[in-house]
Amino acid sequence: MTHQTHAYHMVNPSPWPLTGALSALLMTSGLIMWFHYNSMSLLTLGFTTNLLTMYQWWRDVIREGTFQGHHTPIVQKGLRYGMVLFIVSEVFFFAGFFWAFYHSSLAPTPELGGCWPPTGIIPLNPLEVPLLNTSVLLASGVSITWAHHSLMEGNRKHMLQALFITISLGVYFTLLQASEYYETSFTISDGVYGSTFFMATGFHGLHVIIGSTFLIVCFLRQLYYHFTSNHHFGFEAAAWYWHFVDVVWLFLYVSIYWWGS
């Protein structure tokens, strides 16, 4: 590394890919044990090792990029391409759920009663909690943009305030979604409506939790002065992800809650 004559980051050997793979094996095996034998010990072990791996791996990435200066402009360009491709893969992930929903709803089979929602299903009112959830996520999209512009202008105080508001709105959305699930009259096992509804909105809720975690890490990093107006890709990637989550929810609201009800 001392005689490096190029701008690329030659990554040092790391144990985290191996521990990450092992934790994934433990989690998938643990899920099977939980489903079939009602034992959560293997799942808990896998989840714990996965969390530890993520923490230590991203800790190393922060050290390399923030303190050791390995994230040169050309490395950041590669990271940007990687984040864009990751979000594109997520788009296709959710496209599968929308495909399943529209495939079932546009031509409901006789088993469903020939109508949508299927006979016996009482859908949620789209003008109640779902509309509030939409307002909350749209407001969080505004506040994350405010945080980004504040960071670009070097206004640390406003950046922290806007980021805190965004995190609070994300947590509020998650609580609203949980309360909505608690009040539904149908379950994930209630045919194709229940399965598509809970899979699509559930995975979106998981993405909101992941995005909120990203933003909390960015908030803590900003407290320690990790970001500058021209070197803040970690925050930028989290903001892109949050906007993606925001847009997916709009499609979910229009498709499943409003049109689908």
Swiss-Prot record:
The chain crosses the membrane at residues 16-34, 41-66, 73-105, 129-152, 156-183, 191-223, 233-256. Residues 1-15, 67-72, 153-155, 224-232 are mitochondrial matrix. The keyword DNA-binding does not apply. Residues 35-40, 106-128, 184-190, 257-261 are mitochondrial intermembrane. It comes from the Eukaryota. GO terms for molecular function: cytochrome-c oxidase activity. Its main location: mitochondrion. It is found in: Mitochondrion inner membrane. InterPro entries: Cyt_c/ubiquinol_Oxase_su3 (IPR024791), Cyt_c_oxase_su3_dom (IPR033945), Cyt_c_oxidase-like_su3 (IPR000298), Cyt_c_oxidase_su3-like_sf (IPR035973), Cyt_c_oxidase_su3_a-hlx (IPR013833). Its EC number is 7.1.1.9. It is a multi-pass membrane protein. The keyword Hydrolase does not apply. It catalyses: 4 Fe(II)-[cytochrome c] + O2 + 8 H(+)(in) = 4 Fe(III)-[cytochrome c] + 2 H2O + 4 H(+)(out). Pfam families: COX3 (PF00510). One of its GO terms (cellular component) is mitochondrial inner membrane. GO terms for biological process: mitochondrial electron transport, cytochrome c to oxygen; respiratory chain complex IV assembly. Keywords: Membrane, Mitochondrion, Mitochondrion inner membrane, Translocase, Transmembrane, Transmembrane helix. Belongs to the cytochrome c oxidase subunit 3 family. Component of the cytochrome c oxidase (complex IV, CIV), a multisubunit enzyme composed of 14 subunits. The complex is composed of a catalytic core of 3 subunits MT-CO1, MT-CO2 and MT-CO3, encoded in the mitochondrial DNA, and 11 supernumerary subunits COX4I, COX5A, COX5B, COX6A, COX6B, COX6C, COX7A, COX7B, COX7C, COX8 and NDUFA4, which are encoded in the nuclear genome. Component of the cytochrome c oxidase, the last enzyme in the mitochondrial electron transport chain which drives oxidative phosphorylation. The respiratory chain contains 3 multisubunit complexes succinate dehydrogenase (complex II, CII), ubiquinol-cytochrome c oxidoreductase (cytochrome b-c1 complex, complex III, CIII) and cytochrome c oxidase (complex IV, CIV), that cooperate to transfer electrons derived from NADH and succinate to molecular oxygen, creating an electrochemical gradient over the inner membrane that drives transmembrane transport and the ATP synthase. This is Cytochrome c oxidase subunit 3.
